[in-house]
């Protein structure tokens, strides 16, 4: 008897599925959502910085050039990283992801340019060496979250080839029993195209440097196979030696600014090869990682901002730090698109709602609970901010601050 009643209830729920095709989470109006989102962002930023209240705004009129340069480099790096990983369906959801990261920039140690060149072959340069001093953060080895090596590729109009493969290596201590290099990454690059920043993930390498200072012998960018040129079929062309035709800003002689030209010297330093380190301050990390979640692709800004989609989608929301939050202590950016998710969620039996009938029955028996699908964020991106605590400038990365896509869940 009880089984028959259950079957009747399930049948009625299936029949009602079409009429109950909208989520119960769709009754909120946009103004209400915006107010809630603004307040959530206020608390989120303070929480990620481990601040109990907003710091007093700085009276400094001008931001130091090196601080602004660090902010711009970090922002550009994050844009590149998330652009390259747009197809990655996984996202870490750990405590280390949550809290803000302190940003450090280390420029390449400048020296005589010939010290940056390696001539494995007798007729030309095949490698470039990049050295860095990261000893100032050695005590924070366990707090390293990410490290990126960035170098600006410049066009080479006199190049004999249109494309060349380069490979990045960690230089190891000389030992007859092990290799002298450790491969990190490789890229196929145009030699004459417009200038572009190249980024390489060197987290493991820098972590080793922080752990053992003597292991920091620098990085090497080399052509794929020094001293040889290959035919399209893979055969080696004897007696034709390949040399590096990729040019890098800050390491090639063409960049010599001349004596006394402070403006060009400053520009060269801004564009010189450098490391960007993201460190988690010890006071912001109390617990071990909280695990990872696999996420599926959702409706993103590319679709939602171009279409008048009424169902669940990401909606644009610009937050002005001064006008919306009443904050003067954040110097850069002045505001950003935080965005939010809103819209009805289809309440139909599908791959994502296989148990919709069971959820419906649960809703009937538990009217106060919410088992209906809601429009929620799926993919989020970080935000880089420049702010002052007293007279000390800080550049930090705040994770998961920009909603890029949504899903029904």
Swiss-Prot record:
Domain of life: Eukaryota
Listed GO MF terms: cytokine activity; growth factor activity; identical protein binding; transforming growth factor beta binding; type I transforming growth factor beta receptor binding; type II transforming growth factor beta receptor binding; type III transforming growth factor beta receptor binding
Description of post-translational modifications: Transforming growth factor beta-3 proprotein: The precursor proprotein is cleaved in the Golgi apparatus to form Transforming growth factor beta-3 (TGF-beta-3) and Latency-associated peptide (LAP) chains, which remain non-covalently linked, rendering TGF-beta-3 inactive.
InterPro entries xrefs: Cystine-knot_cytokine (IPR029034), TGF-b_C (IPR001839), TGF-b_propeptide (IPR001111), TGF-beta (IPR016319), TGF-beta-rel (IPR015615), TGFB3 (IPR015618), TGFb_CS (IPR017948)
Entry GO terms, CC: extracellular matrix; extracellular space
Similarity field: Belongs to the TGF-beta family.
Function as written in the Swiss-Prot or TrEMBL entry: Transforming growth factor beta-3 proprotein: Precursor of the Latency-associated peptide (LAP) and Transforming growth factor beta-3 (TGF-beta-3) chains, which constitute the regulatory and active subunit of TGF-beta-3, respectively. Transforming growth factor beta-3: Multifunctional protein that regulates embryogenesis and cell differentiation and is required in various processes such as secondary palate development. Activation into mature form follows different steps: following cleavage of the proprotein in the Golgi apparatus, Latency-associated peptide (LAP) and Transforming growth factor beta-3 (TGF-beta-3) chains remain non-covalently linked rendering TGF-beta-3 inactive during storage in extracellular matrix.
Assembly mode: Interacts with ASPN. Latency-associated peptide: Homodimer; disulfide-linked. Latency-associated peptide: Interacts with Transforming growth factor beta-3 (TGF-beta-3) chain; interaction is non-covalent and maintains (TGF-beta-3) in a latent state. Latency-associated peptide: Interacts with LRRC32/GARP; leading to regulate activation of TGF-beta-3 and promote epithelial fusion during palate development. Latency-associated peptide: Interacts (via cell attachment site) with integrins, leading to release of the active TGF-beta-3. Transforming growth factor beta-3: Homodimer; disulfide-linked.
Protein name as it appears in the record: Transforming growth factor beta-3 proprotein
Lineage per the UniProt record: Eukaryota, Metazoa, Chordata, Craniata, Vertebrata
Gene responsible for this protein: TGFB3
